[in-house]
């Protein structure tokens, strides 16, 4: 259910873009993200920090897109969010000395510190790479290509990277954890 609520605004954005334009889609994205946030709160009585940060960025950049009638803002949103996620991961590892990935998953999984560090760094690089890819697609290719890339390309990349991370985690789990 949680994944559906997270994915719903993206579907709304895509459908509204295909039926109308980038401005209707941006407004619908802001509204759908707000609805998803409220529904998440009502169902789980908590909202993850990543979800809240995403909502704030969607609200800011979506509103700026509508107020200034300029799609550059909604295009930059993707890169800004990915950069913030990458920075959070890197700061947690370098400054706070405990990878954010470990803080998020460490209660369920026991892995060597080196594995947590590599996984954390890999996700930081992944987010930076996605942010850079977004810049290229958003500003050098047609808007319709960017929308497809944002909805399908980045979603597929994230799913593949999540799967690869799962394989990496599994290979580094103890035999006891693998069988429990």
Swiss-Prot record:
Cellular component, GO annotation: plasma membrane
Tree of life domain: Bacteria
Subcellular location: Cell inner membrane
Membrane-crossing residue ranges in chain numbering: 22-42, 50-70, 76-96, 121-141, 149-169
A Pfam family of this chain: IspA
Keyword tags: Cell inner membrane, Cell membrane, Membrane, Transmembrane, Transmembrane helix
Classification via InterPro entries: YciB (IPR006008)
Claim: Nucleotide-binding is one of the keywords in the record: no
Primary residence: membrane
Membrane topology term: Multi-pass membrane protein
Record bears the keyword Translocase: no
Entry-linked HAMAP family: YciB (MF_00189)
Similarity comment text for this entry: Belongs to the YciB family.
Known function: Plays a role in cell envelope biogenesis, maintenance of cell envelope integrity and membrane homeostasis.
NCBIfam families per record: ispZ (TIGR00997), PRK00259.1-2 (NF001324), PRK00259.1-3 (NF001325), PRK00259.1-4 (NF001326)
Name of the featured protein: Inner membrane-spanning protein YciB
Organism, scientific name: Edwardsiella ictaluri (strain 93-146)
